[in-house]
Amino acid sequence: MNKAITDGLVLTPPPFSAGLNLWSREDGTPGSGSYANQPNAAYVPADADFGGCLELQKTAIPQKLRSYGETPIIPGLYLRVSARVKAISGNLPSVRIAGWAGASNNTNVSSVPQVGPSVQLTTHGEVVTVSAIISTSNRSGVDMAWGNTPVYGHFGLDLTGANGGVVRIDDIEIEDITSAFLRDLMDWVDVRDFGAKGDGVTNDAAAFDAADTYARNNAVSVLVSKGTYFLNTNVTFTSKVRFEGTVTMPAQYRLSCTRDYNLDTYEAAFGSEEEGFRRGLQVLFYFTDHTVFDLGGRRVELTGPVDVAAVSGLNTLAQRRVLSNGRLDAANSTAWNNASATSVATYTPNSNVFRLTAVANVANIEVGSRVSGTGVGREVYVTSKDVGAGTVTLSRPLWGAAGTRTYTFTRYKYLLDFSGFTSLGKFEITDMEFQCNGEASAVMLPKSGIGFRFADCTFNKPKDRGITSIGDGCQGMFIDQCQFISNEQSLRVQDRTTIAVNVNANDPKIRDNRIVRFAHFAILSGSGNLLVGNHFFHGDDETAGVRRAGIVFTQPNVKTLITGNYIDNCFI
């Protein structure tokens, strides 16, 4: 900041060549005496050192020289008044910068210091520079701290000491040197000050670490100024950080902002809300000094499924983590298109009820695909596959007899896909809306894990499924106070295909939810189910329409508690 440039302030007083009537021999206030026609003052047009200058004989104690101009005093502005002086003859005086502090009512603020450090002239002909810094601030380096009462000043210098000496004074300068105080004024450091290039090619990780270390030790924050910063390793900020520039880093590396762990920070860091969400979610599975990724009520538009295991780089985690307080929207994109494969396979229940063998084209079958075909029950999914052995592992046994048949494997696409986790326990999703827009399904659970929890969430218009379990990741799952709103509300009951929830394992707690016009609310394959206080209605607009099951139990020994539910236009 330089007020002379940015605001056009005129700081430097007129040169002596403009006339000595512009210079006061008193305080510089209106009506005070000037140096015009004074016997002890003269303008010298061609001094060897100064060019034009003022020659002044000291006849008063002190001998004052002040500009009549009113230099503004502005909070946050630092002024340096300087003058070059040399003794010509006679006694050698001392020289100091001086001023007159003027209040808004044009009275002198006598309580503030109005003189700067004194410099003794010791040799005739030697050029000496005197200066002083004036500001409203009392920071170190300020010679005259004036506070907020003075609003202007008349500046110049004083000659002190014995009278009789003659000096020459170069034009007095007043300059804005606020920039010299910026580092003390600012509570941040720039990564470029520590060697970061921001060219998108050079690895700036070491500079980021150095800036963070300095910021932590000095209780300031870090600024990532404009540029593109390549980080080729993990980087952790233990200090607060603000991004004007962006970062790029390989997918396997993490940016951990432990004091600014929020979507706004990661969006700024990576240049888009979608990439910011993915990167913020990535570090949730590591140490960020947080257990919750709070989206702050933000909406994130996703152009494709988020493979959470691939994003995190992990396949197991048993520590509690929470994604909360936001909305995920499925953008219009071909990335949501279902994938499908058809293969001939053999089912031998006497050998393994969960396995298909001799599967043709097994490489084309995606883990998480729903299996359909003769002898296949409800909500049977591919849990894993072995390309070399030509086998597919199923989430549930088939009801059909042994034999070789053709099966279809359909892979739905989900906003959040946890199927890459071998085991994930105690993960929670709270206060989230999954706005599927008929483009995508909502959440696919991990292969195994205990205590996955949904609370106060809305599943809006899933294309195929709301919550899908392809294994035992639903063991002890909580679904509390959620809404499931179908994308098929206008269709006849018999034409609907979407399912809100399926569960394979035991002990889910499904409570106080509202479910609107799906083909089915829940397909439950385990036992120990607890369904309390849910309202699920699956009617249509037909006069005498077909009714289907709201809840389907696929095993005979269900050991289930169904209490206080509103079962509307459907059955169990």
PLM feature spans:
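Right-handed parallel beta-helix/beta-solenoid
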Residues: 175-207, 247-248
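Right-handed parallel beta-helix
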Residues: 292-297, 319-330, 369, 425-436, ...
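Extra-cytoplasmic beta-strand recognition segments
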Residues: 16, 60-97, 130-136, 171-172
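Short carbohydrate-recognition loop motifs
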Residues: 34-64
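Small/polar beta-strand repeat architecture
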Residues: 177-184, 255-278, 337-351, 360-367, ...
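Extracellular beta-strand ligand-recognition surfaces/modules
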Residues: 131-167, 172
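Extracellular beta-strand/beta-solenoid scaffold signature
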Residues: 256-284, 304-313, 339, 351-354, ...
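N-terminal extracellular ligand-recognition/capping segment immediately after the signal peptide
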Residues: 63-64, 205, 209, 216-291, ...
